[in-house]
Amino acid sequence: MGNSLGCSASGERLVSAARDGDAVEARMLLELSPALARYSTFGGLNSPLHFAAAKGHLDIVTLLLEKGADVNVRNYCGQTALMHACRHGHWEVVQMLLLFRCNVTRADYLSGRTALHFAAHDGLVRCVRLLLADFVPSAPLEDGASSTVDGGECQTNSGSSPCSSLGLKFNESARLRYINKPADGGVTALHMAALNGHFDCMQLLIDLGANVSAVTFPYGTTANLIGAGSTPLHYAAGGGNAECCQLLLSKGASKLTLNCNGWLPIDVARMFGRRFLEPLLSPNSNSSIPAYQPSNYLALPFMSILNIAREFGLLHTVASVDDSDLCAVCLERSCSVAAEGCCHEFCIKCALYLCSTSNTRVEFTGPPGSIPCPLCRNGIMSFTKLPSTPTEGLKSSSALTFCNPCMLNTRSVDSPATISKAEIRRNRVAAVSSELVCPLTCSPFPSSALPTCRCSDDDPCDAIETQDGSEVQSPQPSHCASMEMDKREQQDLDRTSCSGMFWSRRSCHREEQCNAEINA
């Protein structure tokens, strides 16, 4: 049962094309039957979007999303395409999923791991930076004013910022909750990065608010080897990376914290044969701890350019016919945004990739977190759109247009009012979201208790209207019920999964099944 709602020959071909990276085949199939993009798993364990994201096929991921694939669809284990892209380090796929407004806070059914846990486990710092982009606002100028661009000249408008001009809201507590979200056993993303010795990833997480004193829980089975109640310093000591231990100590981690087994970090180091860490972790040690600068991967302009790309489009930027208006980086597309401060102009795609690939190890003029301008080497804190930028936007998928209950209505926005019976039979499950058909075996996991509507108070779901203008009551819950569901989901986000099955045979078997299907 579950998501396996049946299959067809064209569905099998789409799965194979998504797995093998055959963009021509995938495009042909979706042109013949666009509803294929909204199917869930075609009788398997993963959707075509999962296959394409795990393999890093950016063109197929983009094609599926434009054709209406649910960006937050889950597989048999409750994992999203974003988790697969982060697990395999495909940061360009992560970036594309973020442009289609995927939900980064979702956790899988097995252990409560988010995409941030998957990225931190392997030290994929670019993926970590992308996942946190919506939680880190582009800082304003020192005088509290922001600049806009008019006719190529930089002007100052007080009381306005790039984030406020797009109607964005920033919630610091949401960032701290997400970055410190514990998985099964209380393991955070910082624990995972510390255990595997990923210094750059740890530094970025700490700079953005990761708790260096977070402890694992006395229940759960993910941390039995080191012990419950362990801090990231215990994990770094077990991993054996001296630089990671120094970083944690410089940020306030304590050498005297005992875990539930009564072990200090130095005891964990001895158990794992890390004797070279004893002078550093000894409670009586007087060894000097270096002071660390902010992370080289901190990119404050990310939020501004990411939301400009969402609103004004990234994929459909036309080439410029005027050489004077060409982007100085790619020399192909017309300039659409300007760097705040130096006012140099770029196309949206180049500005986005400047933030995605920035690794400021060279000297430049700018505050921490700014990225160097490729033309003048001055620091860029945010981007602003040019007045002449056309509002094209990304082609919305059904997952962005409707919440899950509204997707039960099989009539698409772009489809005609009258639909033949044959088309109804062919597309009878096309609009059913995977969230509505959860596998029965996932019910014991707390993380599977998801609300059926993702609409917020500021962006309610639009009611579907009939041809005569009268509203048709959509099958979404009442406003009070939706608020209660959102509150319940937030409680589920804060509460870790204590299923005790993260490393159990059943959970591992389910995850191995999904991974084996992708790697086949």
Curated annotation (Swiss-Prot):
Q: Which SMART domains match?
A: ANK (SM00248)
Per its record, the protein catalyses: S-ubiquitinyl-[E2 ubiquitin-conjugating enzyme]-L-cysteine + [acceptor protein]-L-lysine = [E2 ubiquitin-conjugating enzyme]-L-cysteine + N(6)-ubiquitinyl-[acceptor protein]-L-lysine
Biased composition (Basic and acidic residues) is annotated at 484-493
**Mind listing the GO biological process terms from this record?**
protein ubiquitination
Query: Which residues fall in a compositionally biased region of kind Polar residues?
Result: 467-479
**Which keywords does this chain's UniProt record carry?**
ANK repeat, Metal-binding, Repeat, Transferase, Ubl conjugation pathway, Zinc, Zinc-finger
Stretches forming ANK repeats: 44-73, 77-106, 111-140, 185-214, 228-258
User: Where does the signal peptide begin and end?
Assistant: none
**Which organism does this sequence originate in?**
Oryza sativa subsp. japonica
- Which Gene Ontology molecular function entries are recorded, alphabetically? transferase activity; zinc ion binding
Q: Does the keyword Metal-binding apply?
A: yes
Q: In which pathway does it act?
A: Protein modification; protein ubiquitination
Q: Where are the zinc fingers (RING-type)?
A: 327-377
Q: What is this protein called?
A: Probable E3 ubiquitin-protein ligase XBOS33
Q: Which residue stretches belong to region Disordered?
A: 467-493
Q: What is its EC number?
A: 2.3.2.27
What is any Pfam family matched here? RING_XB3-XBAT31
The source's domain of life comes to Eukaryota
Q: Which PROSITE patterns match?
A: ANK_REP_REGION, ANK_REPEAT, ZF_RING_1, ZF_RING_2
